Amino acid sequence: MSPRIDISIDELPEASSLLDGHDYSSQIIQRIAGVPVILDASGCPHSPFFEVEYDDRTIRFTSRHDNEHIVELGRKLDYVHHNCSGFLKTFFLRIDVIDGHCYSLSNHAKSLSIAFRTGGRVGPFLHLLSSHYFCVNDFSVTQIGRQEVKLSSAACTQTMTIKRIENRWIDVLCFLLGRTMASCNTNMPLLIERYCKSARLHHGLSGIEAVIVFSNKHSPYFADEEGRRNVLSLVDTEAIRRLLSPKLKDPSFDYGVNKSDEQREITAKLSISYDKYYPNKKIVKLIALQLASSGRYHPKLMSSDYFSPQSDWADIHLLLIPNTFNDPIFIYYQLALLTGLGNRMRLQKYLSVLSRYFSGMISRQEFNERAVELFGEAACFLPIGRLSSAFFMRNTFPEEGLRERILNVLLER
């Protein structure tokens, strides 16, 4: 029997935001309740994969395929949405083993599926489960963590199937169709109220850190420690956190920007790049406003994939990473490679500290303290703070207690 989604009008967003159209090769792909459909010339929705019906109270999506084809459906729709760009080929995944159960990418009839999306090869990561690191290439897995974990075992009683879903609307669709048991996505904070009305779904907050990094080796700021400090000193991170706060309703609050009308001479140009990933654009706009208001910089914003050649042109990049300070080893290693810590000598000091940690000569806390000190000296990045991201989890799981254990990891209790 084909799966069907019935969505009450009461659970939909305001009428003004119900349809969000984008032009792709003369076809309009609309988002209705998070489900992509194509509107023909007469405005009627249709899809090669869904029967779409709606009346005054309900919108109904009926799949033309059974559940086993939902992932392929996601691939095909994403293929259309991104103009034949397909999926990212390589990225990193952090995953854990809960209560001795082995979680992997293998398919299993009684598997627990977790949907996730990623904006690049290294970041931003989906922070679902921690402790082990894997490099994923087209669903093949190579472990780069320190502990040995068997990725496929006949003795596994519970397997987690990881679905790579690049499109956020397909992410929601697969969740609604029951193909995924949980979904974590930083595109979701503004959609929390829409979905939390349903008693069948769980929603909560997980932590993702926003970080400004000087990673362009061709930028004059890359080797200019004083210049980096001058730029970072003008960024009001508290104002950015207030801007992103979902509880803040007053539009007249202080953005941390000097609003004086006094005309100042612009002394330096500065380019800032950011991924097309919520809420990066909101953050960089405020950063640009803060820098411009000082009269010392003329910021230019560049939207690009961090790992595309375009990102090398910018002086600063806004990066989203999970739990910068709670999980320092892999995160600081990335930042060290991206920024070079300002000079070769400081980078060598960091690598020496890292080697001592892996050899057991210093503790995790000592490593963290030394890393904070070295990065503070370099002034090559600035943590803005933890952002709000929503995840959704069904209230029923095949194994008793598994939901609570995963929630504890997600919420870092």
Please place each PLM-identified region on the residue numbering:
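Detector for C-terminal structural segments
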Residues: 4-12, 23-30, 35, 98-110, ...
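Extracellular/periplasmic solute-recognition and catalytic clefts
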Residues: 143-156, 160-218, 319-324
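Alpha-helical secondary-structure segments
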Residues: 58, 64-79, 177-178, 198, ...
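A bilobed periplasmic-binding-protein/Venus flytrap-type ligand-binding module shared by bacterial periplasmic
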Residues: 40, 64-65, 115-119, 164, ...
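Ligand/substrate-recognition segments at binding pockets and active sites
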Residues: 155-158, 262-322
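Surface-exposed binding/hinge segments that line
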Residues: 53-80, 84-138
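N-terminal lobe/hinge region of extracytoplasmic solute-binding protein
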Residues: 7-56, 82, 88-91, 131-136
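Short, well-ordered beta-strand elements
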Residues: 2-11, 58-61, 112-114, 147-151, ...
